[in-house]
Amino acid sequence: MKFLHFIFAASIGIYSLSTLQAADLMSIYQEALAQDAQYRSARAAYQAAQEKLVQGRAGFLPTITLSGSRTVQQVDANNVFTGVGNINPQEVTIHGRGAVLSATQPIFRMENIVIYQQSKTEVSRADAQFIVAGQDLILRVAQAYFDVLDAQVDVEVAEAQKKAILKQLEQAKRNFEVGVSTIVDTNEAQARYDLTTSQEIAARNALEIRKRMLQGIIDRLPENLAGAREIASNLTSLRYGSMDEWVRTAEEKNFALKIQQAAYEIAAQEVKKVWSQHYPTVDLVAQYSDQTGVGGAITGRGIDLISKSIGVQLNVPLFQGFSVQSRVREALAHQNRALHDLESTRRSIALQARQQFLNVTNGIAQVKALKQALLSSKSQLDSTILGQEVGVRTEVDVLNAQQQMYSARRDLAKAYHSYLMSRLRLSAEAGELDEEVLKEINALLLL
């Protein structure tokens, strides 16, 4: 029975060791918020897009320009003032200075109105894109986290199997030495031990690769991650009960769909913007000009010329070589493409929502079945060990039962992680994935 106690202790240690002083999913996510280069790039793009509204509003504001000039001119006085006798000096230098202040206030420019409407839509699209980037970060962090947990389970199972098989190998050798078993039992145990050693090496290599992938997100190598101490008993607490409810929610709230809707609106506004070049423009224009220093050395007097003007300027486009008509047709084609892209995105999101809902519901059933399979495999191992002690089971039977129990434990852990990941993806498709949802998933890991 000591061997049986060793098996149970090793199987319990698979989870207890992995959660000792380990980082949980939320702490890894908080690190990713600060360190992930892809998310920081999305944040910079979001900040840049906010300036679109300022740029669009600028079309309603006046433009003011100030220009100045300073000139020096050499004049042949005899050529300029013919018939007045000799002029001294023969060449005259004329100095001039000037300044012009002008302002234009748009009164009606249809193109500027459409540009402003476009800028608001572009900001809305940027908002949705940044939210999608945040949801994508949650999914990438969770997937990398669960990948590491899966790899940890593989390593821990391989270690436990190796220890148990080593124990069995040592027992088989002792039995052979005292003559109560054949060399076949020893060879069988040795073959199993060699196989598990190879599997342990492969599992450790896979774990290192998975950790490096998570390192690419949080910019440090994770040492130890918290896994589930036990499987949650309540796996059915979904916000919506039916698949159709999830699909309707996804079609209303999904942010990838909102991005595509904004793209269609921008394309439609582009048609209006191009067509607006047929419209006249009306501007209020004003100018102040001050020119000094004209004349000077010849007449003995300086001239200071000041002019002021204000008025309304009307520009009516009459003919632009059919370029506007061509660009309108081009914009209409882009609008039509955006409409088809929108419908394609809508169908894809509905499909993804259905798939993730099925993954969640099937995952619940799979986890429950694997929990029962684990209990059954433990009972089978108990019976096999007892059978070996009374002589009705062999060493190979014990090894097979042990292998089946470890496989059931590994499959259960991976199915549970897959179920949790499907819940996150389902929330993302419904447009509801945020930190609160991630906290709920993290709580299911820390039971």
Language-model segments: which ranges?
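Amphipathic alpha-helical coiled-coil segments
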Residues: 41-56, 133, 137-156, 167, ...
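Metallo-beta-lactamase
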Residues: 203, 255, 415
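Acidic, low-complexity, intrinsically disordered peripheral segments
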Residues: 74, 411-447
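Periplasmic alpha-helical coiled-coil/stalk elements that build and connect Gram-negative outer-membrane
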Residues: 136-249, 359, 363, 367, ...
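Short flexible linkers and secondary-structure junctions
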Residues: 23-147, 282, 286, 322-325
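Bacterial N-terminal signal peptides
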Residues: 5-16
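Small/polar, glycine/serine/threonine/aspartate-rich low-complexity segments that form flexible
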Residues: 67-105, 230-239, 272, 285-320, ...
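Bacterial Sec-pathway N-terminal export signals of envelope proteins
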Residues: 20-69, 75, 105, 222, ...
